[in-house]
């Protein structure tokens, strides 16, 4: 993928408009409870400030009604936190689309919630042109919204004098390209989660590329059904058994594999107090719920991971939130941490597992995108990246 990158541009004295993803969780009082996304935006902002650029940053926050900016929609708490992290005050500019505000060289301002502007979500061309007129260089650093064609992620990139990827966006593109376009083999994908239906496209796409497709959670239960196993009262989608079988057949025809559990951890309920039993997969009873893979299966998965050249990880293999059902995900996480392979991981549950088992420093790249990460792996064109590609030659 060819896109211009911020690090390759001379931004000195230029007006730089950065679309970041500062959509952080807040409590009922509006206090920020987790600031990873704000921290992830700092390298691009600092790069521009250190070179005496005039820096404008905007982001969405939540799902405001266009044309309104209620108290819960404001980026004011973000401006305070950003200022603390940068060690300098960050002014919040409201009603900024028409311009009329001053920003000094070496100063950064935060432009109020971009989704409060009428036309943002529909990628309105007139709005995009007005925003493009505010800057000399447009920087997209919001990979988490790259799958959405909106005025600040797509339209502005068409009309700004220069359009480029920020530090974070560039790193995401590089890591995903490394994992998917010319990966070191064997290529192993781990896809966990509750439902095949939400991951069907990605499973089909990966089945055409990977050497091993490890499935976990409710997804694995549907594959077990397809292979003729009894799963008791486990979460599954019987109506998608044919699709699961087709994916296994596709893998087999390529000489690849979907390694299914030979033993499982079951209980009669999903709770912190549930009693866990380890049993062979052929002994699952009519009222059992499969909530994790067993130790033999975990060891097999760990061996597959140990021999991988590239690992793409999206989702746990068990209900790891409860310790008695965390063994499979824990062993898999440990295997990834000790692997020589390049690993890219993404998705909320995956990030929670990485945090729980303290392996963040051992993962090659942790993606900040949820839906964008999945759509990239599905092989879809992400509108925001496509817009940057279209401006590469300018």
From Swiss-Prot:
GO CC terms in record: cytosol
Binding site for substrate: 21-23, 37, 60-63, 115, 148
Pathway(s) served: Carbohydrate degradation; glycolysis; pyruvate from D-glyceraldehyde 3-phosphate: step 2/5
Keywords from the named record: ATP-binding, Cytoplasm, Glycolysis, Kinase, Nucleotide-binding, Transferase
Amino-acid positions noted as binding ATP in the UniProt annotation, renumbered to this chain: 199, 321, 347-350
EC supergroup of this enzyme: transferase
GO BP, sorted A to Z: gluconeogenesis; glycolytic process
HAMAP family, sorted: Phosphoglyc_kinase
Membership in a protein family: Belongs to the phosphoglycerate kinase family.
PANTHER family per the UniProt record, alphabetical: PHOSPHOGLYCERATE KINASE, PHOSPHOGLYCERATE KINASE 1, CHLOROPLASTIC-RELATED
Quaternary structure note: Monomer.
Protein name: Phosphoglycerate kinase
Protein's organism: Aromatoleum aromaticum (strain DSM 19018 / LMG 30748 / EbN1) (Azoarcus sp. (strain EbN1))
Lineage: Bacteria, Pseudomonadati, Pseudomonadota, Betaproteobacteria, Rhodocyclales
Gene that encodes the chain: pgk
């Amino acid at each position: 993928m060819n896109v211009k990158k911020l690090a390759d541009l001379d931004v000195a004295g230029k007006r730089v408009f950065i679309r970041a993803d500062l959509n952080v969780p807040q409590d009922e009082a509006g206090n920020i409870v987790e600031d990873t996304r704000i921290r992830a935006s700092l390298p691009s902002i600092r790069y521009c400030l250190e070179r005496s650029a005039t820096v404008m940053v905007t982001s969405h926050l939540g799902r405001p009604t266009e044309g309104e900016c209620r108290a819960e929609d404001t980026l004011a708490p973000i401006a305070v936190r950003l200022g603390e992290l940068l060690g300098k005050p960050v002014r919040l500019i409201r009603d900024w689309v028409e311009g009329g505000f001053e920003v000094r060289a070496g100063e950064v301002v935060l432009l109020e919630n971009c989704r409060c502007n009428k036309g943002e979500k529909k990628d309105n061309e007139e709005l995009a042109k007005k925003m493009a007129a505010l800057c000399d260089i447009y920087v997209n650093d919001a990979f988490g919204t790259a799958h959405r064609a909106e005025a600040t992620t797509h339209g502005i990139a068409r009309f700004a004098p220069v359009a480029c990827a920020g530090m974070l966006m560039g790193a995401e593109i590089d890591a995903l390209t490394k994992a998917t376009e010319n990966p070191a083999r064997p290529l192993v994908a781990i896809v966990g989660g509750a439902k095949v239906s939400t991951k069907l496209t990605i499973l089909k796409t990966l089945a055409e590329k990977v050497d091993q497709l490890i499935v976990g959670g409710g997804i694995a239960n549907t594959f077990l059904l397809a292979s003729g196993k009894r799963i008791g009262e486990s979460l599954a989608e019987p109506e998608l058994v044919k699709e699961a079988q087709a994916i296994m057949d596709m893998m087999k025809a390529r000489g690849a594999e979907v390694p299914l559990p030979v033993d499982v951890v079951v209980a009669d309920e999903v709770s912190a107090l549930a009693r866990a039993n380890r049993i062979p997969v052929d002994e699952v009873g009519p009222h059992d719920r499969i909530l994790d893979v067993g130790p033999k299966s975990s060891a097999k998965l760990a061996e597959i991971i140990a021999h991988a050249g590239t690992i793409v990880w999206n989702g746990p293999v068990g209900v790891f939130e409860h310790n008695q059902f965390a063994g499979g995900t824990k062993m898999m996480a440990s295997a990834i941490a000790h692997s020589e392979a390049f690993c890219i991981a993404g998705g909320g549950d995956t990030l929670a597992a990485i945090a729980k088992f303290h392996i963040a420093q051992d993962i090659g790249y942790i993606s900040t995108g949820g839906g964008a990460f999945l759509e990239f792996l599905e092989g879809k064109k992400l509108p925001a990246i496509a817009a940057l590609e279209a401006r590469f030659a300018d």
